[in-house]
Amino acid sequence: MKTVTSQKMRELETAAVKEFGIDEDVLMEHAGRSAAEEILNCFLSENKEKKVIIVCGHGGNGGDGLVCGRYLMERGVDVYCYIIPPFQGSYKGLVLKNLKRAFFSHLSVKEIYQNLSDLKNSVADAYIVIDALLGIGFKGEVKKNYKETIEVLNSSPSIKIAFDIPSGLNADSGQNEGAVFKADYTYAMGFAKQGCLKAKDICGEIKVLNIGLPKELLSKV
């Protein structure tokens, strides 16, 4: 399995935008759709009424989660999204764009504040819980609100899927500071990240998804 560092992945995505004219929005749409198709094919092919919970951050990983939620909803899945709002300021960029799309498509999205009781109740009987909180840009110690959210997700008896990398895990070193999402499956976007292969006990089974990177870029890795 080919792996990349977080820096190399950012370079590939930047090259896709600047050299091949692929908009970042297109890459995110492709990633979210690929994840939705994988979930449908592997877990929901016979019963789409099982509950799916997607918990998003306000960065790129959260955007992937919102896109995935929209596609699952359009396919008739019982899906609910939660999102941790920015500590300061407001939503920006692709996350804001996909929140608007979620609103117009009637996808259920709730913000997570200090009271986690609603999230606890939701994940308690969920069939699948998806971690779309923190991505490859994360380094260091997990902030309190994210830490508490991760603990709630880990308490669920559901199938647990991490988008790109489990939240709390360093994408390069595979280290964590204690608060880390423990996945049964990790859906690596484009390429598996180096840290995943160093933390297989946390990442579970790694599945690499196509996010629409040009063949010319894929061949350089």
UniProtKB/Swiss-Prot annotation:
One of its GO terms (biological process) is P-body assembly. Residues 9-219 form the YjeF N-terminal domain. Catalyzes the epimerization of the S- and R-forms of NAD(P)HX, a damaged form of NAD(P)H that is a result of enzymatic or heat-dependent hydration. This is a prerequisite for the S-specific NAD(P)H-hydrate dehydratase to allow the repair of both epimers of NAD(P)HX. Pfam families: YjeF_N (PF03853). Disulfide bonds: none annotated. Its cofactor is K(+). Belongs to the NnrE/AIBP family. Binds 1 potassium ion per subunit. PANTHER family: ENHANCER OF MRNA-DECAPPING PROTEIN 3 (PTHR13612:SF0). The keyword Chloroplast does not apply. It comes from the Bacteria. Keywords: Isomerase, Metal-binding, NAD, NADP, Nucleotide-binding, Potassium. (6S)-NADPHX binds at G60, N61, G62, G63, D64, G135, I136, G137, F138, K139, G140, E141, Y146, D164. This is NAD(P)H-hydrate epimerase. GO terms for cellular component: P-body. GO terms for molecular function: metal ion binding; mRNA binding; NAD(P)HX epimerase activity; nucleotide binding. K(+) binds at N61, D131, S167. InterPro entries: Rhodanese-like_dom, YjeF_N_dom, YjeF_N_dom_sf. The keyword Ubl conjugation does not apply. It catalyses: (6R)-NADHX = (6S)-NADHX; (6R)-NADPHX = (6S)-NADPHX. Its EC number is 5.1.99.6. The lineage of its organism: Bacteria, Pseudomonadati, Elusimicrobiota, Elusimicrobia, Elusimicrobiales.
